[in-house]
């Protein structure tokens, strides 16, 4: 048997092909001919048998006596399997209005094949040597024709590691007609440079630059007379070096779509789509969307497209996702300081060497990021664990990963052994799907400073609940089993808060009547009552829930058989435990890196199951399971808090979702004593729960713990090895829409308080003053970032993803601005008025769009807040935003609104200072600067000449 590491499966012309890397690092192709899809047919009318309908269309029918729907495990005996002869037969049957429903018809052929054959979607397999063929159809070094996939191919779980892949990193540079306008595929907006870095694993094999003719190049640059020749050389480069993947940054958002457009202009699109290992097959152009971003790629045979931008966006929360910011964040290296206008000017003048170095450096940064983040290994291990393809990980959402694992567990090798059929329509109609339900339990904290707080949390709480309670689609029953019943009341007459709010409303009404009855001269009393009523109205509004709930729920789950979800989760958690144990005994750094990515993949995959169940739409929604899991989680945390107080004698400081923060022992207990008490408390409380539920000690003690409200606290932690670290949750440091100067101010004050510094007020005042002094901080410290959704680019009648608060107001304003018969002018005016009602960052994005600059939907834009003409925080915020790149070029003419930045940090810092006992220092500093600004405003108005 030959060992092959499969990195791609695909289906074409009733043949499954798997491309992989052999032990000698060559690419091989495994071909499985005549694999036919199998669907499962549900008989909806017992008086009519639809089997004859399928046999007449060429289907081969199999009896599946144990098959039933995954939802509720109902309908045993009403299903049969049918093997699809061809696409046309499947289409004809689907158009037949018969007494049947077809299920599992939307599952991809490769997912079905790997599930039935028990093969990994990405990973090591073994292929019989007798399957090697000499007459090949691909350019692979070796081809295997597998006539019997049941015996001639099998998984190879004993082989470890991920072989190095030959990857080419690339980046393109494009000319634009206007220096400040983003390229839009006009006739002369050509691709004039392509930077290439060819690597095998972490080893760089060669670095090249392909370019149109330039006047200052040396002999190492490959130059071509036309854009068509340049693109042909790029295609030939990928083919010649036999790569398994092309990689870049945002290549699915810009580079590949633009190359497709230029190839279409130069009549080379067919050649571009034949880059794969089978040059006779025309690859399919596909589009995908994650969040608000649209991605375009070509599904080449044996050549993957890896875009680092969506991968990093899904795995890391950063302030910005520009390549320059990401590279500086991870590898401490940035792009060359070249602006788009410099790129366009270089093409127009022919002096392109500097831009060429910039282009190549971008590709090198992508290579460094892949090496640093171990992206290739991470993608391979995650895809193998989730039973998906590599590209599905970042072109589709989380749900496909869970669906693939459930489908694999429900798919036997022999179709007659089928038990659970996954319905194409998702959830059955008799399963309750409410629009919202109560979330996790929260033990309300008392704000303050606490010492020696011990954090305890449930290990994999929701997966453990699903396993211990056997919560699954297939175990939900109407009668019998274990019942989970509860009520949810919020904002209704059964809610105690409702009675308090009602009483408060009555009191407000009485006060208003009393105030109306006061004599006119009682101005002071009326003012006091008005202030009191205003405070009570604010309190009344805060007590009003966003959603009114008045529900009674009851679900039953049987323990007669193990459900699919518990079995899948048990395998994931047990596999992760085995991998983590092996990491401790492995000395090989390469194997350790692979195992670490694998255990992380198991963890992420297990945690994704609960979120997938709780969706309204998707592959397998299961609100009953999600609600029951959440309910059990609430009961567990309540039980844990009760046990910690009664059995262990702990004091509960705070509890939330899956964590408890407690105090043990006496005030003078040493850290070693507290450590041992925490371990004993974990063992004692865990003994009261069903396995695998366990309350774990987090292996650290918070020597100082400052909590403000639920989900918002800061701490200083002590670990067993004597190290100390500070941390936080839910405060300004966690918010990406805060400027770095604000976060640095908060971090400095937080560290000073946690470390017990005597200079806390001085540090707060100094940090606040630094924000007001020009030159004291770096320009980057004032950058704000926010994500921008679709703003309806290019269409004045389309407002994208944003909702306009008052369209009637916008229509009225637009009508006043233009003549009644000017339809085009009205559309433009209406667009402008609508944009005024969008968030400030969307207004900035609209201005950038009108200037011809690219605004990627879903990306985070960097901007600064400009100073008002009088220096006071007045005027609409949307009109005072400017993107950071443009501001940096003209910052002398556009001073910053430093009061805005100072105000943004006042409330958060003062909450920290007041809770720690220092008083509202920051608000006093801000008030002084604000008063100074208003004095300056009055002076400017008096000194400004009148016209």
From Swiss-Prot:
Family the UniProt entry places it in: Belongs to the DNA polymerase type-B family.
A single BP term in Gene Ontology: DNA replication proofreading
Keywords: DNA replication, DNA-binding, DNA-directed DNA polymerase, Nucleotidyltransferase, Transferase, Viral DNA replication
Enzyme class: transferase
Organism: Red sea bream iridovirus (RSIV)
Protein name per its UniProtKB record: DNA polymerase
Catalytic reactions of this protein: DNA(n) + a 2'-deoxyribonucleoside 5'-triphosphate = DNA(n+1) + diphosphate
Example of a GO MF term: DNA binding
Keyword Ion transport tagged: no
Keyword presence, Transferase: yes
SUPFAM superfamilies: DNA/RNA polymerases, Ribonuclease H-like
Matching InterPro entries: DNA-dir_DNA_pol_B (IPR006172), DNA-dir_DNA_pol_B_CS (IPR017964), DNA-dir_DNA_pol_B_exonuc (IPR006133), DNA-dir_DNA_pol_B_multi_dom (IPR006134), DNA/RNA_pol_sf (IPR043502), DNA_pol_B_thumb (IPR042087), DNA_pol_palm_dom_sf (IPR023211), DNA_pol_type-B (IPR050240)
Enzyme Commission code: 2.7.7.7
PROSITE patterns, A to Z: DNA_POLYMERASE_B
PANTHER family in UniProt: DNA POLYMERASE CATALYTIC SUBUNIT, DNA POLYMERASE DELTA CATALYTIC SUBUNIT
